[in-house]
Amino acid sequence: MIKTLFVFGTRPEAIKLCPIVLHLLSRPEEFQVTVCVTAQHRAMLDQVLKVFSVVPDYDLDLMQPGQTLSQSTSRIVAALEPVILETRPDIVLVQGDTTTTFCGALAAFYQHVPVGHVEAGLRTHDLAQPFPEELNRVLTGRIASLHFAATKGAASNLTAEGVDPRAIFITGNSGIDAVLQIRDRLDLGDLPQTAYPWRDPRKKLILITAHRRESFGSGIESICRGIRRLAVRGDVQIVYPVHRNPKVAGPVQQLLENHANIYLIEPLEYVPFVELMRASHILITDSGGVQEEGPSLGKPVLVTREKTERPEAVKAGTAVLVGPDEHRIFEQASLLLDDPLEHTRRSLVHNPYGDGHASERIAAAMCSFLR
């Protein structure tokens, strides 16, 4: 019996860890599962937990308005210590690159508990992009005993840093497990008119997400100007679930509100967001998860960042780096809108991030490593 403690706190972590939680729970003779959430992102975390019917054993509820990174880091590490001492796990599983990820790994390290890092080995090799995520994942990688890399490229990053190859397992990305499970629940066809009464199925839908810290200020403003130029076309509808952070919502509202063909909506729960991705013609995003999910749904992705820790989609052709640059956004989106062959070429490439079976591979790796 392997005693496994999951630690996570945000929506992206929950999306990528819940499929693993459910898989381990389906094998009760092999795994004892404990789930601890920090609630770094309270509302959006709860939405995902509900979708996957995962009930935390520990809810630390540490989110406070206006917390600095230093404050949240110290509070999370301190709050996790008694949880680890009480549960005495054989392994602590963390995912990705959030403050909770690093704090979960650090708290486990302080108690001499091995750490398994899901989605290990992503690197931009620039600590400022993304900030603070690049440092979080580098430090988590130094602490981890088990590294679950989604791709060969991520595994190569780890070996280049001196990680023992025997501790690296190429599993695919568990986020693909999640999106394929949700996709199979959805009805076919366009978006429901009740939820999106403005939707005209004759027009091509463009989905926007942008929330990265490194894009705050001039970056978000430039992205918005590119979107505004695209909206002049009569054959598109642009939908933007706007992040609640004032540094995002402020310029977005100022530059895009009340423009024809642009629809600013509230942040979406996970299932409606997957539904919206599936109905879209193009995805324009700075999100790491959307860069992975887009290829699974056959959607070309324009990445509004100068660097990405997920180069596989760029190499495969399904994603293009356009930066927070209004001209590149407009040019690349126009190409996909005007050239059906180019759109098809970018939509049909093989998804480099996984096949929906990462959870099983992660479970098998833990069994071989810990027994």
Locations of regions flagged by a protein language model:
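Nucleotide-activated sugar donor-binding and catalytic core shared by glycosyltransferases
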Residues: 1-240, 245-371
